[in-house]
Structure formats: C-alpha cells, structure tokens
C-alpha cells in the first residue's frame, strides 16, 4: 500500500511542481496588478478591443460594431479565441486578461509535459522542458493558438492509441474554440489531413485521425461562418486587403531569420536549441546501432521534427522572397493576402519537443555523469535565455526598476481616469453622450479611446471595408502626399486606419514626456465632420489648428497621467 502511494506521489509530484513554477511566473502580475507591463503591439492596441467588443455584443445579434470606424462589420474584429470572449463577458477587461494569461500558461505547461510523458520521456526532463515552454513570451491574446498546440497533439496521439476517447475529443474541441482559424487553424486542419493520408496508406489510425479532423473542422466553421461566407461566397463588402501590396525579402535572409531568430508571434529562443539538437542527431546517427530501441525511436522522431522545422523555414522563406511576392501581388485575392506562411507558429512545439527528445537520448545513452553534465549545461543555457526573454522578467524589472524599463503599463496605456475626465467635460459642455459623436486620435492609439467608451472613426483592423479605407484616406491625403513612408504604410498595407503626420508618421505611442508638437499638420476636417467626428484627441499641440477649423477646447493632464491630451473640437 505504501509502495503504491509512493508511486502515485512520484507520478503526480513533478506535475504539481510544474504548476507551482508556472504560478510563480504569474505572481508579478498579481503583485503589480494594473501596473504590470504587457507588450502593446497586437495586444493592447488591437486584440483586447476585439474581445471587449465581442463580449459587449455577444448576445445582441449585431452584425456591426458601432463603436469603431463609424460602424464596422463583425468580420473586421474577429477574436482569435472564442472561449476568451466569455472571460470578457463575465469579468472587467483587466481581470479577464489576467485570467486568460494564466489559463494559457497552464495549458502550455500541461500540454508539453503530458505530450513528452506520452512519448516516454523521463519526468525530470519533461518537467524542465515544459516549464521553459510555458515561460516563453506567448501573446496570450491569441489564446491557445501557439501555447496549446502540445495539448492538441497529445490528445490526437492518445486518440490514435485507443485511450479514453471522450477526454481526447474534449481537448481537441477546447483547442479549436480557443484558437484562430486564420492564424493557425488552417495549418492544424492541413496537418490532420496529411496525417490521415499517411495513416490510410499504412492502414493505421484512419478512423481516429479523420474523426479529429472533422471535429476540428466543425468547431472552426461554427466560429467563423460569417468570415468564410465573405471570403468564399462573396458576402459583404470588398476588404481593404484587396489593395495590400506585399513586400518581399531575399530568400536567404528570410530563411536565416526564421531558422535562427524565429518570430515574436511564435517565440522559441531557438538559437540556443540548434547546437544540442544537431549534436544529438549527428552522434545519434553515427552510433545508431548502439542505441536502445527507445532511443532509436526518439532519434527518428527528433529527425522528423528537425525536418519539419527545415521544411517550414523553406516554405516561409519561399512565400516571402521577392520573386514569389511579385507573383502573389499579380495574382491578387486570397493568394496575395492570406498568410499561409504562418505555419511557423508550430515552431515552439517542434523545437521544444525536439529538445525533450534530445535530452532523453543524452540521458539514456551517455554515462550517468556525462549525461548529467551535458543535460545541466543545455538546460542552463536554454533556461537563462528563456527567462531573460520572458514576460516574467519584464514584470520583475517593472517591480524593482520601472524607471529603466521604458514600457507602459496597462494603467498608463488606458489612462482611465484621464479619459473619464474628457468624457465628462464633453458631456457637460454639449449634453451629448459618447454614442452621439465620434472622435479620432492623433499620436495616441485609437484603442485607448475605444476601451474608455468613446466611439471612433479610426482603429486597427486587418479586414475592414475597402470603401471605408478610401473615405478615411481623404482625411490624411495631404500628410500621405508629403511622406513616401506614410503612403507605403497606409496605401500598401492599411491595417492601422489612423491619423498620421509627415513629421511623426503613424507613430502613436506618445506620452506627455515626449513633448510632441505638430508644426505643419494638414488634415481634411470636412471629411471628418462628414463622419460625425466632433473631436480630435491629440498627443501634442497642433500649431495649424485654426487653418483646419479646429478649436482647442482644453488640455487634459494629471500629475500621474501618462498622456497629455489636447482636445480639439472640429468647427
């Protein structure tokens, strides 16, 4: 009895210690609360708004969100994770963000730990690799799109091995409802199809893989029906993506970048993983016949993972090289603007699973002292690299030396007290509620205004109306004409439908410490008035305000506020 109890404890203890390690990495968020720092790009300036609006209109049946861009289609602001919307429906935005962050960290650790154990990797190695994986700086706004891939693969493997099917189906559905079809789901479906084809050829696991595919497909279609109808049935207005002009790079530059540096959307610290994995493959190949059966199987798996990493890198570099980009631009449509190269989002899964396999081979095949020395050296290097690049490190820095970090916190970024003061002032002066007029932001992200209840004519969206892009262009046309970079940014891309200036471009992170002054700004305020835009919330003084029929109403600033907002009324 005692022996069985000890075995159960030994089996569960590493997992519980891993949960504690992940929770320790989360503690700075709880200590700092709204003073914690979160990378702004694509999170605070975009996806947080999609969750906020998605939750606000979850049950009202609206096909248009009136808060942004004078009313924008739901397809313009599709949340990457449907289940995360539910968090925002029952919690205020910041607690919802923190809860989602913790869920993503737990899923990352749990999935990688269970997957390695399923493949026969020692629990000590599985523990270390899974903790490192969970500490990678994932963008939690994308839900389980990247961090949850090990959990999905674990569920599929268990399904194919004939384990309890219902939990496997539940995990597959959980992943699909917590991830994005556009960002990674298409690649997941493609991988399941390829696996099913190989299974059919070998007459193994056909039913299980096909079931996993159709379950995943059903989940994604259910969430994205309106978007799929827009793309494939021509429903809705043409997207601004029709005018996107892709920019290519040299093939070798693209290949080197993705294989060595990776990408912020799928962080890996992979430059520290290349040498140990390559060394294991080299020496494992040389001494293959001397290895145990398990090590041979893991060596084959490591080789397969390395091959997939290389193939994905080649595909990414090919899709973005100058010659292919020119062809894509000429063909247009889905071929041009769909980023199929995002299959590199599999990289964290592939790299860290390969690391776990490599460490297990070292542990099993080398003499004990050599194995421990090699393992500690590899884990030490990788662990330090992961820790230094983690969100945990950023927020520990914020706790002790915020003045040297130079990143804005949630509280600073959204500056709720200052924007509440602006809202109250406008309501007292005009009697209008926020839904009765529109605002535009200059030098400040429009997301700040939206999250503070304002209705805007500007926003960050990767799929809004082409007609609206043309209408908005009238507002900033003169500033575009004065800057080739502005033209490239708006005309050839245009996801950030923002006010801009020739002096500062589309930069929109200006706190009061920058002392911004717009010396020669020329905006078409008549076009803004046609959109019912009554006010500009500017990060700096506009010296040409009178020439544009702008009246400075008031300057809003508090001692502890991040912004200094110049409120201009359009006359």
Task: Locate predicted features.
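Periplasmic/ER-lumenal interhelical loops and adjacent helix-loop junctions
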Residues: 223-287, 341
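Membrane-interface coil-to-helix junctions
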Residues: 21-108, 135, 140-144, 471
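Membrane-helix boundary/interfacial segments in multi-pass membrane proteins
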Residues: 136-143, 298, 310-353
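Start-transfer (signal-anchor) and selected internal transmembrane alpha helices
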Residues: 1-29, 296-297
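Signature aromatic-anchored transmembrane alpha helix within multi-pass, membrane-resident enzymes
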Residues: 217, 360-395
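Hydrophobic, aromatic-rich transmembrane alpha-helices
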Residues: 273-310, 354, 358-360
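Extracytoplasmic
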Residues: 392-571
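Membrane-embedded helix bundles of polyisoprenyl
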Residues: 105-201, 212-229
């Amino acid at each position: 009895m005692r022996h069985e109890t000890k075995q159960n404890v030994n089996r569960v203890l590493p997992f519980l210690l891993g949960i504690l390690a992940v929770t320790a990495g989360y503690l700075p968020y709880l200590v700092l609360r709204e003073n914690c720092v979160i990378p702004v790009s694509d999170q605070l300036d975009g996806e947080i708004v999609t969750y906020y609006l998605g939750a606000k209109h979850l049950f009202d049946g609206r096909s248009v969100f009136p808060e942004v861009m004078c009313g924008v289609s739901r397809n313009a602001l599709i949340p990457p994770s449907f289940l995360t919307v539910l968090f925002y429906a029952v919690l205020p935005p910041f607690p919802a963000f923190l809860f989602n962050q913790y869920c993503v960290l737990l899923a990352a650790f749990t999935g990688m730990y269970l997957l390695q154990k399923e493949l026969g990797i020692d629990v000590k190695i599985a523990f270390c690799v899974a903790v490192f994986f969970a500490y990678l700086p994932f963008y939690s706004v994308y839900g389980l799109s990247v961090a949850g891939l090990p959990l999905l693969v674990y569920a599929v493997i268990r399904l194919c091995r004939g384990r309890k099917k219902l939990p496997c189906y539940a995990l597959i559905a959980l992943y699909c409802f917590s991830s994005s079809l556009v960002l990674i789901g298409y690649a997941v479906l493609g991988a399941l199809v390829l696996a099913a084809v190989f299974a059919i050829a070998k007459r193994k696991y056909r039913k299980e893989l096909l079931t996993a595919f159709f379950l995943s497909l059903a989940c994604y279609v259910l969430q994205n029906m309106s978007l799929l109808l827009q793309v494939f049935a021509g429903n809705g207005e043409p997207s601004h993506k029709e005018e996107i002009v892709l920019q290519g790079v040299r093939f070798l530059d693209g290949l080197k970048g993705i294989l060595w540096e990776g990408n912020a959307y799928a962080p890996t610290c992979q430059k520290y993983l290349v040498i140990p994995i390559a060394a294991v493959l080299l020496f494992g190949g040389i001494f293959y016949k001397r290895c145990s059966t398990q090590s041979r199987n893991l060596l084959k798996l490591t080789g397969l993972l390395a091959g997939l990493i290389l193939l994905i890198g080649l595909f990414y570099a090919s899709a973005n090289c100058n010659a292919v980009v020119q062809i894509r631009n000429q063909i247009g449509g889905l071929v041009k603007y769909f980023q199929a190269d995002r299959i590199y989002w599999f990289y964290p899964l592939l790299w860290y699973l390969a690391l776990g396999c490599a460490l297990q081979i070292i542990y099993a095949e080398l003499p004990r002292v050599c194995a421990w020395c090699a393992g500690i050296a590899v884990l030490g290097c990788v662990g330090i690299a992961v820790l230094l690049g983690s969100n945990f490190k950023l927020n520990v820095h914020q706790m002790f030396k915020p003045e040297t970090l130079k990143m804005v916190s949630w509280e600073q970024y959204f500056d709720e007290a200052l924007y509440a003061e602006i809202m109250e002032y406008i309501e007292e002066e005009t009697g209008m509620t926020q839904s009765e007029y529109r605002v535009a932001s200059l030098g400040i992200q429009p997301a700040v205004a939206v999250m503070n209840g304002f209705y805007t004519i500007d926003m960050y969206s990767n799929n809004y109306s082409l007609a609206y892009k043309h209408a908005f262009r009238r507002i900033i046309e003169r500033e575009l004409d004065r800057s080739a970079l502005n033209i490239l940014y708006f005309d050839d891309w245009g996801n950030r439908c923002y006010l801009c200036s020739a002096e500062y471009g589309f930069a929109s992170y200006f706190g009061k410490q920058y002392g911004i002054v717009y010396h020669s700004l020329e905006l078409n305020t008549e076009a803004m008035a046609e959109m019912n835009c009554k006010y500009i919330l500017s990060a700096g003084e506009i010296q040409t305000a009178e020439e544009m029929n702008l009246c400075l109403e008031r300057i809003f600033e508090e001692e502890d506020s991040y912004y200094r907002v110049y409120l201009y009324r359009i006359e």
